[in-house]
A protein has these predicted regions:
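Residues lining the SAM
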Residues: 104-106
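A short glycine-rich, Lys/Arg-flanked "PGG" loop and its adjoining helix->strand segment in the class I
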Residues: 118-130
């Protein structure tokens, strides 16, 4: 499973307006602008660049070097961003004292099992200073088990075409992506499979508390409403606002 094959077209077919909603959620979650931020699984850096004007320093990392190459190429004059390659399961112990950490775009769902989830959350918590804020989102079981079941999508422009199909097994969804990239009069076909897994809410809450967070708030609609089990049965994402 890798984003390498689709790094160059990731933003082209992504809903970039969603990143503005993540930014609003982030800024509304703190009373004072954060000085030092860790952006976990930053991808092509779209959210990182949106947040940069509101903080002093952002360290942003991703597992996929191809995604980071795109991020660096779009960085421009934002000198307060530092991109680097890293695995959220093996973070450098010297990276500490962050005011805030973010992990959006359901990135935690790409971890393979509960043990990896627990390890990643513990590493993130250890990077934060006491009272530091962690913001993230994950797919809900409804989204994975129902909304993604039989999902298919097609989009195209002058240079690329995207075919996207999803298969579901339990709370695991496999996304089969095919990109056709125009090369002169021909098209190059690029195939990749991305697998995501989610869990019942209790698993996430328990893992966050065990990782070292003292407060865990669960929200929906990009932080617009506190999650209520009966009222939000068809919510697509859970948003977590956590304090160390």
């Amino acid at each position: 499973m890798s984003f390498t094959a689709i790094a160059k077209v990731y933003d082209r077919f992504n809903d970039l307006e969603t990143y503005e909603k993540w930014l609003d959620f982030t800024l509304s979650s703190t009373n004072t602008p954060p000085q030092k931020v860790l952006d976990v699984a930053c991808g092509t850096g779209w959210f990182t660049q949106l947040l940069a004007p509101f903080c002093e320093q952002i360290d942003a990392f991703d597992l996929d070097e191809a995604m980071l190459e795109v991020a660096r190429s779009e960085q421009g004059e934002q000198a307060n961003i530092r991109y680097f390659q890293a695995d959220m399961l093996e973070l450098d112990a010297l990276m500490t004292d962050y005011d805030m950490a973010t992990c959006y775009a359901d990135s935690l769902c790409f971890l393979q099992n509960e043990q990896q989830l627990q390890t990643a959350l513990a590493h993130i918590a250890q990077r934060l200073k006491k009272g530091g804020l962690f913001l993230c989102d994950v797919w809900t079981p409804y989204q994975v088990g129902t909304a993604f079941d039989g999902f298919n999508y097609f989009d195209s422009d002058d240079e690329y075409a995207l075919l996207w199909d999803s298969d579901v097994e339990g709370l695991t969804v496999s996304h089969y992506l095919t990109v056709f990239a125009k090369k002169g009069d021909l098209y190059e076909r690029i195939d990749t499979t991305l697998t995501e897994k989610t869990y019942p809410l209790k698993v996430y809450r328990d893992a966050l508390f065990q990782a070292g967070f003292s407060q865990v708030e669960v929200l929906v609609d990009y932080g617009q409403d506190v999650y209520h089990e009966r009222r939000h049965k068809t919510a697509d994402r859970w948003f977590f606002r956590c304090v160390k």
